[in-house]
Every structure is written in structure tokens, then in C-alpha cells.
């Protein structure tokens, strides 16, 4: 089984818009699927990690035979985030095929 892992900068550290980054992520994820990758792992941090997870979930829900593993640092990792990011995190976690918390 071939896997892709996502890690990336937080949104405030980026010099491109969310829309530009998400479009780039989608192109690369589609290319990875074409190359035979089926499992995608996200560290679930704000920014690139969650955006990538959202793209994977959307493509999976539209019929791509892929899986998302959410590898979150620990339960409650998102508590200090804005409500918007907390919602996106919770939605991605709920949609993931596998959820793992790395630290107790």
C-alpha cells in the first residue's frame, strides 16, 4: 500500500491564499491517486494539514478509492483554536477512516 503524508505551514506563515494552496493540493493529490497512492495521512494541524485532509475527504466522498488517516498529536489539540478551525478539525476527524492520537 502506498501512502502520502501531509505536513505544512500554518496559515499565518503562508504567502498564498487558502484557495491557491487548496487548488495545488488537489492537483497533487489527484496525481498521487493516479500514481497508485491510496492512503493519505494528515497531522491535523491548522493550515495545510487540515486543507489536505478536506481535499482527500471530498475526493473520497466523490468516489475515489482512497482513505484518510488522521494522526493528531493528542486529544484536545484543537482547544486553543478559533471556533472555525475547531469545526474544520472536528469535521475532518469525523470523516477520517482511522483516527490516531500520537501522545496520550
Each model region followed by its residue ranges:
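Acidic/glycine-enriched connector segments
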Residues: 1-104
Amino acid at each position: 500500500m502506498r501512502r502520502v503524508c501531509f505536513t505544512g505551514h500554518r496559515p499565518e506563515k503562508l504567502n498564498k491564499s487558502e484557495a491557491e494552496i487548496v487548488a495545488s493540493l488537489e492537483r497533487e493529490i489527484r496525481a498521487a491517486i493516479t500514481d497508485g497512492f491510496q492512503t493519505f495521512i494528515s497531522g491535523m494541524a491548522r493550515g495545510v494539514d487540515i486543507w489536505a485532509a478536506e481535499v482527500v475527504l471530498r475526493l473520497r466522498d466523490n468516489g475515489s478509492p482512497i482513505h484518510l488517516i488522521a494522526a493528531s498529536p493528542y486529544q484536545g489539540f484543537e482547544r486553543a483554536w478559533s471556533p472555525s478551525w475547531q469545526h474544520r478539525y472536528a469535521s475532518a476527524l469525523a470523516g477520517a477512516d482511522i483516527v490516531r492520537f500520537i501522545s496520550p
